[in-house]
């Protein structure tokens, strides 16, 4: 990725593409209904769906933000393109999830699932190191 005058140019060939093989569990946080999904490389990913309410622009923003964070030296989980087959929805019973899966067939965005990770909470102790906090805020 190269960052220059109000322009972010990314070489998307640097991202691997994996095939979603199993829908594990929805993450009912946020508006996009991401899910933990197993891929054909036997790894778990948090999949962000192109068919979610925010649409494909939200995934593009997440991809760009993740790669900018990586370029700045922040620890960012691996980002991958995830192919979603229409066959993955055949056993889903939840109508909302089923609609999302059907609307998201094709290319989506995934990030490596981090077991034991949790959302940032400023009340948790100890706070992040000052140099890490300043790098994130920058």
Name each model-derived stretch.
Residues 7-123:
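Conserved ATP-binding subdomain of kinase catalytic cores across diverse folds
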Residues 115-138:
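Conserved kinase catalytic-core segment
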């Amino acid at each position: 990725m190269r960052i220059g005058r109000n322009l972010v140019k990314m070489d998307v060939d640097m991202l691997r593409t994996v095939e979603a093989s199993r829908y594990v569990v929805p993450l009912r946080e946020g508006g996009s209904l991401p899910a933990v999904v197993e891929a054909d490389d036997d790894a778990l990913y948090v999949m962000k769906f192109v068919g979610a309410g925010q649409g494909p622009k939200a995934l593009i923003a997440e991809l760009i933000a993740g790669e900018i964070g990586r370029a700045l030296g922040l620890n960012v989980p691996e980002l991958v393109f995830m192919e979603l087959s229409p066959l993955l929805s055949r056993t889903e019973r939840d109508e909302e999830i089923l609609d999302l899966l059907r609307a998201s067939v094709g290319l989506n965005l995934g990030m490596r699932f981090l077991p034991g990770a949790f959302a940032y909470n400023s009340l948790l102790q100890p706070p992040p190191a000052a140099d890490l906090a300043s790098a994130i805020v920058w």
